[in-house]
């Protein structure tokens, strides 16, 4: 019997395909996004040193939830933290999520706040 894979399993497959291509360096670290049912989490990662340079989430941005307003607030917050550490250029890793809705709002807010990708 043919069974349908869950959407999260398909997302993980897409994420693994993307991770073969996308990697962060010290000059251009990776902006990683994780979307749970309740919150949004964003990290800026240097893959060569395997360290997290800075992070933000929707709990920290005082906008509880995982909607578009929260995504915009988290995007502005992570851009502010990155620019304070001298990070201007990043590689956007959408973690297999479609570039639509919350993910697009987060990316647009990061760009509007001064990050380049």
Swiss-Prot record:
A Gene Ontology molecular function term of the record: 5S rRNA binding
Keyword RNA-binding annotated = yes
Q: Which residues form a coiled coil?
A: none
Domain of life the protein comes from: Bacteria
Gene Ontology cellular component terms for the protein in this record = cytosolic large ribosomal subunit
PANTHER family from the xrefs? Answer: 39S RIBOSOMAL PROTEIN L18, MITOCHONDRIAL (PTHR12899), LARGE RIBOSOMAL SUBUNIT PROTEIN UL18M (PTHR12899:SF3)
The name this protein goes by in its record: Large ribosomal subunit protein uL18
Recorded source organism is Aster yellows witches'-broom phytoplasma (strain AYWB)
Q: Taxonomically, what lineage is the organism? A: Bacteria, Bacillati, Mycoplasmatota, Mollicutes, Acholeplasmatales
- Gene of this entry: rplR
């Amino acid at each position: 019997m043919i069974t349908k894979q869950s959407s999260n399993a398909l997302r993980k497959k897409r994420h693994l395909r993307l991770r073969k291509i996308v990697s962060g360096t010290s000059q251009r670290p990776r902006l990683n996004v994780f979307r749970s049912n309740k919150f949004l989490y964003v990290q800026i990662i240097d893959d060569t040193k395997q360290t997290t340079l800075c992070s933000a989430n929707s709990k920290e941005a005082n906008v509880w939830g995982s909607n578009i307003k929260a995504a915009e607030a988290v995007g502005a917050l992570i851009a502010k933290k990155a620019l304070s550490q001298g990070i201007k250029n990043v590689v956007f890793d959408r973690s297999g999520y479609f570039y639509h809705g919350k993910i697009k709002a987060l990316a647009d807010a990061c760009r509007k706040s001064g990050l380049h990708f």
